[in-house]
Amino acid sequence: MSKVYDWFEERLEIQAIAEDVSSKYVPPHVNIFYCLGGITLTCFLIQFATGFAMTFYYKPTVAEAYSSVQFIMNQVNFGWLIRSIHRWSASMMVLMMILHVFRVYLTGGFKRPRELTWVTGVVMAVITVTFGVTGYSLPWDQVGYWAVKIVSGVPEAIPVVGSAMVELLRGGQSVGQATLTRFYSLHTFVLPWLIAVFMLLHFLMIRKQGISGPL
């Protein structure tokens, strides 16, 4: 076993990385409220795992979306549990994200030199809300359908480009299969990659600059 470890140690310098992580200074004023960002990340990882599991059974078509969700809930082993965890962790992620934003703002964590850390955090907050909007539509029940219709119609109030934005979101003049396909693509591919990039930037900057001091 030691030979295997030595082989990886020689190439990856695992010990140096471990020492760097374990020796990072943590300010004495840090309390439980500074864990809200980590809890948000944990919720996202749960979302990723449970969402990935459901993609094996979910069918993103207007004819089969609702029935596939019912199949997950009633026929798939522990499907009801996986979807319930996905649903409740989504709500928890939004709540923890809001509390995290408030904590950072109230403790001045957005001030120089951490402006870019704050910006990436705000971008991730917007992405998180977008996750909720797109995911809400995927069961394609009455609530999901009308939610999509209302949300996708909001940009129409924007001068000049409003109508074009609505058509882009819906994939046509009305809500239908193209709309569901777009929302499914956003929810399962575009947004996860996007938030992963901003998370990496966010964590690298926190790692570089450290936790902000007390007010």
Curated annotation (Swiss-Prot):
<dbReference type="GO" id="GO:0031676">
    <property type="term" value="C:plasma membrane-derived thylakoid membrane"/>
</dbReference>
<keyword id="KW-0249">Electron transport</keyword>
<keyword id="KW-0602">Photosynthesis</keyword>
<keyword id="KW-0813">Transport</keyword>
<keyword id="KW-0812">Transmembrane</keyword>
<feature type="transmembrane region" description="Helical">
    <location>
        <begin position="90"/>
        <end position="110"/>
    </location>
</feature>
<dbReference type="GO" id="GO:0022904">
    <property type="term" value="P:respiratory electron transport chain"/>
</dbReference>
<keyword id="KW-0472">Membrane</keyword>
<protein>
    <recommendedName>
        <fullName>Cytochrome b6</fullName>
    </recommendedName>
</protein>
<keyword id="KW-0349">Heme</keyword>
<comment type="function">
    <text>Component of the cytochrome b6-f complex, which mediates electron transfer between photosystem II (PSII) and photosystem I (PSI), cyclic electron flow around PSI, and state transitions.</text>
</comment>
<dbReference type="GO" id="GO:0015979">
    <property type="term" value="P:photosynthesis"/>
</dbReference>
<feature type="transmembrane region" description="Helical">
    <location>
        <begin position="186"/>
        <end position="206"/>
    </location>
</feature>
<dbReference type="GO" id="GO:0016491">
    <property type="term" value="F:oxidoreductase activity"/>
</dbReference>
<feature type="transmembrane region" description="Helical">
    <location>
        <begin position="116"/>
        <end position="136"/>
    </location>
</feature>
<keyword id="KW-0408">Iron</keyword>
<keyword id="KW-0479">Metal-binding</keyword>
<feature type="binding site" description="axial binding residue">
    <location>
        <position position="100"/>
    </location>
    <ligand>
        <name>heme b 1</name>
    </ligand>
</feature>
<dbReference type="InterPro" id="IPR048259">
    <property type="entry name" value="Cytochrome_b_N_euk/bac"/>
</dbReference>
<dbReference type="InterPro" id="IPR023530">
    <property type="entry name" value="Cyt_B6_PetB"/>
</dbReference>
<feature type="transmembrane region" description="Helical">
    <location>
        <begin position="32"/>
        <end position="52"/>
    </location>
</feature>
<feature type="binding site" description="axial binding residue">
    <location>
        <position position="86"/>
    </location>
    <ligand>
        <name>heme b 2</name>
    </ligand>
</feature>
<dbReference type="GO" id="GO:0046872">
    <property type="term" value="F:metal ion binding"/>
</dbReference>
<keyword id="KW-1133">Transmembrane helix</keyword>
<dbReference type="InterPro" id="IPR027387">
    <property type="entry name" value="Cytb/b6-like_sf"/>
</dbReference>
<keyword id="KW-0793">Thylakoid</keyword>
<feature type="binding site" description="covalent">
    <location>
        <position position="35"/>
    </location>
    <ligand>
        <name>heme c</name>
    </ligand>
</feature>
<feature type="binding site" description="axial binding residue">
    <location>
        <position position="187"/>
    </location>
    <ligand>
        <name>heme b 2</name>
    </ligand>
</feature>
<dbReference type="Pfam" id="PF00033">
    <property type="entry name" value="Cytochrome_B"/>
</dbReference>
<dbReference type="GO" id="GO:0045158">
    <property type="term" value="F:electron transporter, transferring electrons within cytochrome b6/f complex of photosystem II activity"/>
</dbReference>
<dbReference type="InterPro" id="IPR005797">
    <property type="entry name" value="Cyt_b/b6_N"/>
</dbReference>
<dbReference type="InterPro" id="IPR016174">
    <property type="entry name" value="Di-haem_cyt_TM"/>
</dbReference>
<comment type="subunit">
    <text>The 4 large subunits of the cytochrome b6-f complex are cytochrome b6, subunit IV (17 kDa polypeptide, PetD), cytochrome f and the Rieske protein, while the 4 small subunits are PetG, PetL, PetM and PetN. The complex functions as a dimer.</text>
</comment>
<feature type="binding site" description="axial binding residue">
    <location>
        <position position="202"/>
    </location>
    <ligand>
        <name>heme b 1</name>
    </ligand>
</feature>
<comment type="similarity">
    <text>Belongs to the cytochrome b family. PetB subfamily.</text>
</comment>
